[in-house]
Amino acid sequence: MHLVPYSIKDPKTRKLQDFPSMTIACYQLRPESLGSIHIRSPDPKAQPAIRFNFLADPIDQAAMVGGFRMMRKIVDAAPMDAYRGEEFSPGPSVKADEEI
């Protein structure tokens, strides 16, 4: 899990939000899901076929949902009151595991 004191408005341009914000994220560092990389051509400049296969394993899905819930708990804690604004992504209405 990491927290940075800004958030990105547009990932393509890397422009920051126009208001004070933060980004908090979690990662499954030892995933069970397996992806693949396959060579498609003898040409060394040709792009390989990459299948990331993120979150294919239920263990990874559960870890990410748990991490997300932990992030919300940390941000909702009283010591964060002075710094916390409204959650805008994914938004406070997202509550069910399937939505997360």
Where are the regions that the model predicts?
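FAD-dependent oxidoreductase catalytic-site/capping-region signature
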Residues: 1-100
